[in-house]
From Swiss-Prot:
Keywords: Cytoplasmic vesicle, Glycoprotein, Membrane, Transmembrane, Transmembrane helix. Residues 758-773 have a biased composition (Pro residues). This is DC-STAMP domain-containing protein 2. Essential sperm cell-surface protein required for sperm-egg fusion and fertilization. It comes from Homo sapiens.
């Protein structure tokens, strides 16, 4: 059938709605659009917990689209109405599972991550508390030494003050001594240099006096060289006067003899005395203490705690981002459902085989019209067709619906197990952390069990030092260590019961969709049929033609199946066929394989006690055994012995010169049914085999078979080969002309039609691609 490419198929002239109905539909669509937008806004605000402004903007946008679209557009109205049952389809259930799992991620998973974060914060606080307590213990351990050092420093400061005073006193003494020394040095220098000054000022008196008289003598001798002997008159005066001048030389010689005496007797002892006094006031004070604490760690405990907290935060950053994105699943869900509704509407208008498996009331009316007109019909359906094609209101599911029903049930169970595990994990983590909080909610402080008191008596610097040391040990004993503090108390986050109720409701809705989604999804075809009735009539005609075409091909396939199983003598397996060919395997096969009769048409096993549902061929010597359905499809004629009579056409028979049983059975059946047809069949067989055939042997075998009776013929049946569904063998239709006394189903197949709707030949769908749901 040609595909309909128009999106809108207007109804027939008699069904065109009036103006009043159009107004009512527009008002109803406008109201329904506003209601749906309001429900979406409440869902986003109350369930998802989004911001009011974001919910307001989204609700107004959706309300404008839905109300105006459903009020003034027939296509939008049909698509939105399709969206409601589309939510109960397999794709809608999948999207609802995604939304529910998003709530699970935002609820239990986020709460579990929050509890892990709080646990890491408590661990970091405990590490910092341990660091502070360790530093405090170290400070208290250093306290005795620090006190001793402080006392020593105080003594040193006081000693320094005394030393400063002694230094000032010594400096005063030194200044006085230096003043005396300077005076003595001046005297010493005067005594040291007085001889030189005396000699430089006065010279040697005797020598100077003698030099004066000598100079006078020389001058005289130069003046009066002739009377130089007169110049020697001065010599007596020289001796007398210069002898008196030598007495003054004693004063210049005395300091030379006094200076060494003063150096040895006064200078050296005084210097030694001063040095000895200086040494008495010089002293060295050395205080040495050693205190070393080695902590082999590259990082401090506070840094380790902060690094631990940052590492946990970095690990959870992407998870938190994903959880934040899960809050926008509802708009995405609505958009995808709307796109799926558009896709279903497009497929309904353009693909004849899409979701076309329902036997509707229009289909039944077409069947009644064709039955009244004497045309071939398709009802009742075969067992295989009944599993595929169902009425829309039937409580039974089609074959594909059952398959998807089982698949979706297992998928839902898998999701429920995962969600239950996440919920259990949330409660387990909270229970463990809450138990730890309950056990550690107190405060533990380590105190010294025994206090030792020491008293130091005495005065002086040493007593003060020992007294300070003892007081420092008292401080060390009285110090308390906080092992557990309320500041680091773990406060786990309690699971949200309201969120769990919402999650339970959503998964309950998923379970409802899994159970009844197939029935609700059938409303999509009802909605499209109400909006596009002419398109629905075309789809029904297409389905009727498909069934009628398969019914015609079914008869030819059933004839071939019967002939094939009759050639194999009714054996189902290759081993039984081999045993029939080799007589030596017969006892072995009969010992292990029980005898069972099978329908030659469909291969269904037949119970020996239920003979009401089986039909045996009445022709003598024929092994034909059929179920009621196959025998009705064969026009109540055995296809083994009477196929040339019931299936007119070319003799497509595999015969050779040694085949005697088949032609004799055909002639016997023809003789019983119509002697004239028996004569014609005999002529055709003689032409095919190239020899003459007589009916005498046939009549003899007929007499023998009549004596055996039908009960012995039933026990003489051999096991039949494996059943094949007749509808799975698609062949080209062959001409078939049943007798005039047959029912309407025996007539020649013609395209299904109604007086007012012309039909075209059907285009068979691909068996490997079943129609999607």
């Amino acid at each position: 059938m040609p595909k309909v490419m128009k999106d809108v198929v207007h109804p027939l002239g008699g069904e065109e709605p009036s103006m009043a109905r159009a107004v009512v539909r527009s008002v109803g669509g406008f109201t329904l659009g506003l209601s749906l937008a309001t429900a979406y806004g409440l869902l986003e605000l109350l369930v998802e917990g989004h911001s009011p402004w974001g919910c307001l903007v989204g609700t107004l946008t959706l309300a404008a689209f839905l109300s105006l679209g459903m009020g003034f557009s027939r296509q939008v109205r049909a698509t939105v109405l399709l969206l409601l049952p589309q939510a109960f389809s397999r794709q809608g259930r999948t999207l609802l599972l995604v939304a529910a799992f998003g709530l699970v991620l935002q609820g239990p998973c986020a709460n579990t991550l929050r509890n892990f974060t709080r646990a890491s914060e408590a661990v970091a606080c405990g590490a910092e508390l341990a660091l502070n307590q360790t530093a405090e213990v170290l400070q208290r351990a250093k306290q005795p030494l620090v006190s001793a050092l402080n006392k020593i420093k105080a003594i040193a400061r006081k000693t320094k003050e005394v030393a400063d005073r002694v230094r000032k006193f010594f400096r005063s003494i030194m200044d006085g001594v230096k003043h005396i020394a300077r005076a003595l040095r001046n005297v010493w220098q005067w005594l040291l240099h007085i001889g030189d000054v005396c000699n430089s000022e006065l010279g040697n008196p005797y020598l100077k006096c003698a030099r004066v008289f000598d100079d006078a003598k020389d001058s005289c001798m130069m003046v009066i060289p002739q009377a130089y002997h007169l110049c020697y008159v001065l010599m007596p005066f020289k001796l007398a006067l210069c002898g008196l001048a030598s007495l003054v030389q004693v004063f210049c010689v005395i300091p030379k003899y006094i200076q060494p005496f003063l150096r040895q007797t006064i200078g050296t002892p005084v210097i030694q005395l001063l040095n000895r006094v200086r040494q008495e006031f010089e002293f060295n004070m050395t205080a040495t203490h050693h205190f070393s604490v080695d902590l082999n760690a590259s990082r401090s405990l506070s840094q380790v705690a902060m690094d631990l907290h940052e590492a946990v935060s970095m690990k959870l950053h992407r998870v938190r981002e994903a959880l934040a994105l899960m809050g926008f699943t509802t708009p995405l869900l609505l958009v995808l459902l709307y796109l799926q509704a558009l896709f279903y509407r497009y497929c309904y208008l353009n693909w004849d085989h899409y979701d076309n498996i329902y036997i509707t009331s229009r289909f039944l009316r077409m069947e009644a019209v064709r039955s009244t007109a004497g045309l071939p019909t398709v009802l009742p359906l075969s067992a295989h067709e009944a599993r595929r094609y169902i009425p829309p209101g039937s409580i039974f599911l089609s074959q594909w619906e059952k398959f998807f029903y089982i698949l979706e049930t297992f998928n839902l169970i898998r999701h429920l197990l995962l969600v239950l595990f996440l919920v259990f994990l949330d409660y387990a983590v909270f229970w463990v952390l809450d138990l730890a909080r309950h056990q550690l909610q107190g405060e533990i402080v380590a105190r010294s069990p025994v206090l030792v008191s020491l008293t130091v008596e005495g005065t002086g610097y040493a007593g003060n030092i020992y007294r300070d040391l003892v007081s420092a040990f008292d401080v060390l004993q009285q110090g308390n260590i906080s092992i557990l503090s309320r500041r680091c108390l773990l406060r786990p986050s309690e699971p949200d019961s309201t969120g769990y109720i919402v999650i339970g409701v959503m998964y309950g809705l998923c379970f409802f969709i899994t159970l009844f989604g197939s029935y609700v999804s059938r409303l999509r075809r009802v909605i499209c049929a109400s909006y596009y009735p002419s398109r629905e009539q075309e789809r029904i005609s297409y389905l009727y033609n498909v069934l009628l075409s398969r019914r015609t091909n079914l008869l030819a396939a059933l004839h071939r199946s019967v002939r094939r199983r009759a050639a194999d003598q009714g054996h189902r397996s290759a081993f039984l066929v081999l045993a029939s060919r080799c007589p030596c395997l017969g006892p072995f096969v009969s010992h292990f394989w029980l005898h069972q009769a099978y329908c030659l048409g469909c291969g269904q096993p037949q119970d020996e006690g239920d003979m009401e549902n089986t039909v045996s061929c009445s022709t003598p010597g024929c092994q034909g055994l059929y179920c009621l359905t196959c025998f009705r499809l064969l026009d109540n004629t055995c296809s083994v012995c009477a196929s040339p009579l019931s299936y007119q056409g070319d003799l497509d028979l595999e015969l050779d010169s040694s085949d005697e049983e088949g032609p004799q059975l055909w002639l016997a059946a023809a003789q019983r049914k119509d002697p004239e047809q028996a004569w014609l069949l005999q002529q055709q067989l003689q032409e095919v085999l190239g020899r003459s055939l007589s009916m005498e042997s046939t009549s003899e075998s007929s007499d023998l078979d009549e004596e055996k009776g039908p009960q012995q013929r039933k026990h003489g049946q051999q096991p039949l080969p494996e059943a094949h569904q007749p509808v799975s063998i698609l062949t080209s239709p062959e001409p078939h002309r049943p007798p005039e006394t047959s029912s309407a189903t025996k007539g020649a197949p013609t395209p299904a039609s109604e007086p007012s709707v012309p039909l075209s030949p059907p285009s068979l769908p691909d068996p490997s691609h079943p129609p999607p749901k």
